[in-house]
Amino acid sequence: MKTIREQANEIMKEDTSHDVKREKLLKIGLTATDIQNLFFAERMAGREGRAARPVVEYTIDQILARYTFGVEIECYHVRVNELINKATERGLEMHSEGYNHRDNNTYYKLVSDGSIRGENPIECVSPILNGARGGFDTLKACCASLRECGAMVNRSTGLHIHVGGRITEKQYGNTFANYYYLESVIDSFMSPSRRENYYAKKLVGNVDAIVRARTFRQVSEAMNHDRYYKINCEAWGRHHTIEFRHHQGTTDYDKISYWARFCIKLVHWSADNRLNAPVRSIDDIPFLTDDEKTFFKDRANAFAGIAMVNEIMNVQ
């Protein structure tokens, strides 16, 4: 698969207008600032008789390095001591604690959660992670430990992703507005249990206020200071993060890591971009790579197939 740099170079060499190039560059994940720098470099190169080349371009590793993230995995059927032992064998520090919202940078913690149904329920909470500094490696070890000790999920469990870093007020407001316009297409690759859920409510009822919101305070007011939405504004005051609560419970590393990258890239793209209409297709999500689009389309097709089988069974 071509890197963003390679794709950007090819687009800049095309014999098309700046508007066409700008649209294509946005679709591969560049920000408005990145594109402005590219066009500036092109003009300067033209004056000096040299071939144009990109000045600013972010690889996925560079994007991940700019943000922190955290993962909360709700599950049940977990023997805590066994899970801690499995994690320790993989070099992962893990501790069992009572219910709390304390952040840390070093260890995974197991806490109680009264919303989870099933025997031996827990919420497995990661430390503050960075995707370019081994964060996904420790997450993979955590998922392997959970699956090895028989952790299970059901309709009452969810997966929460926190994204933090130097997020500007404009970027914050844009992220919520963009999520509103992406919500329906995201629903297509989420479990039906997460499309209408008390702990992850739809944003649609607050559309006017959300789209108008430009500041931390305005976003919180638009969301009625309620954290139980698919994207949670109240996490900012406590953790200085944006929390994504949309995803169903899972211990599968691929599902978690693809969704975590989606959330991080959405926040990054929102620094300079604000949608003004609903996105109808996964192919039209502007910050995803072809590989990521394929993954989420496969998830959407899987859920559509399950829905079709259920409909047939109900008819019979």
Predicted regions and their residues:
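Flexible helix-coil linker/hinge segments at domain or subdomain boundaries
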Residues: 152, 184-199, 268-294
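Terminal catalytic/cofactor-binding subdomain
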Residues: 40-149
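Charged, low-complexity interaction regions
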Residues: 12-20, 29-30
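Aromatic/basic-lined ligand-recognition segments
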Residues: 68-70, 116, 121, 173-250
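Helical (often loop-to-helix) elements that flank the catalytic cores of nucleotide-handling enzymes
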Residues: 132-143, 167-191, 252-267, 306-315
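Histidine-centered divalent-metal-coordination microenvironment in nucleic-acid enzymes
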Residues: 121-123, 152-168, 239-245
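Modules that initiate DNA replication and primer synthesis
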Residues: 231-290
